Design a protein with these regions (language model features):
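Active-site glycine-centered loops adjacent to acidic/histidine catalytic or metal-binding residues
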Residues: 28, 96, 123
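Conserved C-terminal guanine-recognition region of P-loop GTPase G domains, centered on the G4
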Residues: 21-22, 45-118
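Switch I (effector-binding) loop of TRAFAC-class P-loop GTPase G-domains
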Residues: 1-22, 33-46
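Canonical P-loop GTPase G-domain recognition
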Residues: 99-152
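Active-site-proximal beta-strand elements of phosphoester/diester hydrolases
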Residues: 24-30
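Flexible beta-alpha connector loops of hexameric P-loop NTPases
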Residues: 30-40, 62-71
Length: 155
């Protein structure tokens, strides 16, 4: 068996933040793959290569799944990202649906999946961790859009 999300990219754009500065473009790529024919894996990698210029890469993991399923998916995704030479400093792992698990499981998930990137646990149903995720996005946007005082050119 294998997993793949068959939907195409989804793009959302927020023109300005609350301070009226900048904006955020979010590209939601296809989902996880495993045990696929080579040509489909190559197509998936090609899709991911388009994301390499992103300021941030958020890897979402459904924390309500079985740990072994999460481990396999995470490991395969990390192998592909490593093969594509993704800058690890841009990578953040987002554990979703944490309202569906005992929050004490979060540390166990991080350990068992051997997650080496920053982790943010969120729940879209309860709002848990959403402020932290928004802060990460806005801080990264602010840093990228900050003007260099000496040249008045964006960094």
């Amino acid at each position: 068996s294998f997993w793949i999300t068959t939907r195409s990219f989804k793009v959302r754009h927020n023109n300005k933040n609350k301070e009226g500065e900048g904006g955020i473009l979010i590209v939601d790529t296809v989902g996880f793959i495993s045990r696929l024919p080579t040509y489909m894996i190559d197509a998936f990698k090609s899709t991911l290569e388009e994301s390499l210029g992103a300021d941030l890469i958020l890897l979402l993991i459904d924390s309500a799944e079985k740990i072994e399923d999460m481990r396999i998916k995470y490991s395969n995704c990390m192998d592909i990202l490593e093969e594509l030479n993704v800058d690890k400093s841009k990578l953040f792992t987002i554990l979703t649906k944490v309202d569906k698990i005992d929050t004490r499981m979060i540390n166990e998930i991080v350990e068992k999946l051997e997650i080496n990137s920053d982790v943010i646990a969120i729940s879209s149903d309860t709002g848990y961790g959403i402020h932290k995720l928004k802060t990460l996005l806005m801080r990264k946007q602010f840093l990228e859009n900050k003007y260099n005082e000496n040249t008045n050119v964006k960094k």
